[in-house]
């Protein structure tokens, strides 16, 4: 896990923001990745190791959902998006609690992450496989998607390359 400029690992930042939003966070970790599991547990996550992570993000997501089958909904968040504000995550959780089935944040009109899916999508989430994750579920139900416009550029900022590690511009700080 690569650190951000402040020295804290990317995934630890993402986990910290989820926990700070008041969520029961389940983190799915590749079987045997004990260093990552330890970091996430220290941040307050409930860690579950998944032996079949080679089956793709969808299978990992299904494994995580299976850990909380009775939940009223799930917020699908990624470890490579550490700059999403906990207040944004809490807004998504609030809409799920109020009965919304599909919720996502938007920044300047552009849909971001994480995406919240209500209980009605539980069976579909539990059946996922491959690398598409929940993308197909969201696409098939686009007309039901509630976009919450928020002043949080972090919802669009994932860290895929070394250049992405630099702090955002002053007017885009998350």
Protein language model features and the residues they cover:
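Nucleotide and nucleotide-moiety/phosphate-recognizing core
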Residues: 1-111, 119, 143-150
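Short glycine- and hydrophobic/aromatic-rich loop-to-beta-strand nucleating segment
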Residues: 113-117, 157-160
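Conserved alpha/beta core of the MobA/IspD/sugar-nucleotide pyrophosphorylase nucleotidyltransferase superfamily
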Residues: 123-174
